[in-house]
Amino acid sequence: LLLKKIPMPMTLRSLLPTLIIPLLGVTAMGLIMVYIIGGPIAAVTNALTDMLNSLGTGNLLLLGIIQGCMLAFDMGGPCNKVAYAFALAAMDTGNYMVMGANFVGSITPPLGIAIAILVKKSKFTSSERNSLAGLLAGAAGMITEFAIPFAASDPVKVIPSLMAGSAVGCTVSYMLGLTIQAPHGGLFVAFAMNNPIYFIIAAVVGAIVTAALLVVLKKDVPAEEVEAE
């Protein structure tokens, strides 16, 4: 609004909505990230990295729980990225179990929601149920972000359910000794797994935990919404 009141040639004014305002907006957000938000985020990221490094792989049960919770908490955000970076660092040392757990913990959220929709569709709106194909594709391709809309619509119930499922999935992955010598790819890199059956077992167990919690915690949506096509 302020920019529209500033005198400027008509040739420039026509660029306001398509170029000038977006450019100024991106610049402002960049400055805020660097000089205001960036410091605290970096501090939290470093603290999380130090915590994972201190755990190492000596206590696999605790590592699986923490790693799974971090992967599912923000699904692509800082916590997720720290856990992924830790898995990449472990790969560099020849430890592929951490990446195996990372795969499982990343796949569990969309797969768990998909199972919950199949089991109890009355807990979900018609638009959410229509996301089933995308959730299954996200699970197959290790794209956790497909679960974000569900977490955003009901974070108090959905996020803890996703975290619990991923924590269980990661822990089962460590217990089975799953290793994956690939940085990403989901089911499409099954050839890089020491045992694809272990991968499926861990992912399904974690997803069932997520689905069960969602079915228990979420309330039924209005009947007319369930019946709507």
Residue locations for each model-derived region?
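Pore-lining transmembrane helices
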Residues: 1-227
